[in-house]
Design a protein with these regions (language model features):
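Extracytosolic ligand-binding ectodomains
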Residues: 1-354
């Protein structure tokens, strides 16, 4: 059965309210607008409603019959922090983010999870206007990187010398072992930005649409050798692959709701929904193949399914009601291509062979 809601929350509510009387209907699947989702959130229906994309974080806790097949923005942010800390063991993390709207909310979720994991980022920098000039923020992050460079004691090199006992019979000059640099060659933290700093292990930079050109071209100037973690707005492949950006962000990771093939073509929403539909149909079929036909059985199997791995997505329900997808795709950018490293659910990281 196929119904057209016309994008109306009222129509969606009317249609869904009428379906429980049809014994042939076991579940409802469809891409709904936010208005339609909110209209159905308070409806107590015996039919599970499967929604391809996520809505507001926390809605799954309030609506038991809504099943979100994609991880929420909060889950994506949490998985990003968990990947850095739990899987990669990073402790020195810096953050650069826009200070309002959805990006600010995403960054707040990330910072909250970092704190839950016992990590306090070494630098958190915000910007409000169009990021045409981020020199202040990036200089502050670079200063934080300098502050992590271990201090060298003046006598360290001399105290670590090993002198053979036979040499002690003669006059020994330290210049016999090494040449001291001239005074004007000694480097300190006031040096030029040409010095590469590796003390910040990871940087989290979620950008808004149309910000890649600004941030992607400024970041390399500050010579921070780190693992960059971005978001889906970095994946404008035509821009990302340009010489002024791509070579400087090799190894960038993006925690996403879909695989690399789908993320790399994220400008084509029709292709995205078509690929998601194939995966979600396969997910439903995997439950039906267990011999589940009745509504109650289907609902129980839905909440307790052990995990599904499709071509473009993975599904493992978490949360109070076991109705929000907790699996995320881990993507890596390198050599002008995007590949999927694996699937991460916060507890285990399943590597792929892509």
């Amino acid at each position: 059965l196929i119904y057209d809601t016309g994008g109306s929350g009222v129509n969606a509510l009317r249609i869904v309210s009428s379906l429980p009387s049809n014994p042939a209907v076991t579940a409802i699947l469809g891409p709904l607008t936010l208005e339609e989702i909110y209209s159905l959130a308070g409806l107590k229906s015996p039919l599970p409603i499967l929604i391809p994309k996520s809505a507001s974080p926390g809605l799954s806790d309030l609506s038991q019959n809504l099943f979100f097949l994609s991880p929420s923005s909060k889950t994506i942010a949490q998985r990003t922090a968990q990947m850095m800390v739990r899987e990669l063991g990073f402790e020195h993390i810096a953050v650069l983010s826009h200070g309002s709207g959805k990006t600010k909310l995403m960054t707040d979720y990330f910072l909250e999870e970092c704190h839950q994991l016992g990590i306090d980022p070494v630098a958190v920098e915000w910007y409000i206007e169009k990021p045409e000039n981020l020199s202040r923020q990036l200089k502050n992050i670079r200063r934080a990187a300098w502050s992590l460079v271990p201090e060298k004691k003046p006598g360290d090199q001399i105290m670590n010398l090993e002198i053979d006992s036979l040499d002690a019979l003669f006059d020994v000059d330290v210049t016999d072992f090494f040449e001291l640099p001239p005074e004007d060659e000694i480097m300190d933290r006031k040096d030029s930005a040409k010095v590469f700093l590796e003390t910040i292990q990871a940087m989290y930079i979620p950008i808004r649409p149309d910000e890649l050109t600004y941030i992607g071209t400024q970041l390399p100037v500050y010579n921070l050798k780190t693992v960059l973690f971005g978001n889906e707005n970095w994946l404008d492949m035509d821009l990302l692959n340009q010489e002024v950006i791509g070579p400087h962000v090799q190894g960038m990771r993006v925690i996403s709701d879909v695989s690399s093939a789908l993320s790399a073509s994220n400008q084509d929403s029709f292709s995205n929904f078509h690929a998601l539909a194939l995966d979600h149909a396969g997910f439903i079929q995997s439950i039906i193949d267990r011999g589940v036909l009745k509504r109650r059985q289907f609902l129980e199997q839905l909440r307790n399914q052990p995990g599904f791995h499709g071509k473009s997505t993975s599904i493992l329900f978490i949360g109070k009601n076991k109705n929000e997808n907790g699996s995320a795709q881990v993507l890596e950018y390198a050599k002008k291509r995007l590949r999927t490293l694996g699937v991460y659910n916060g507890e285990s990281f399943s590597h792929t062979t892509e």
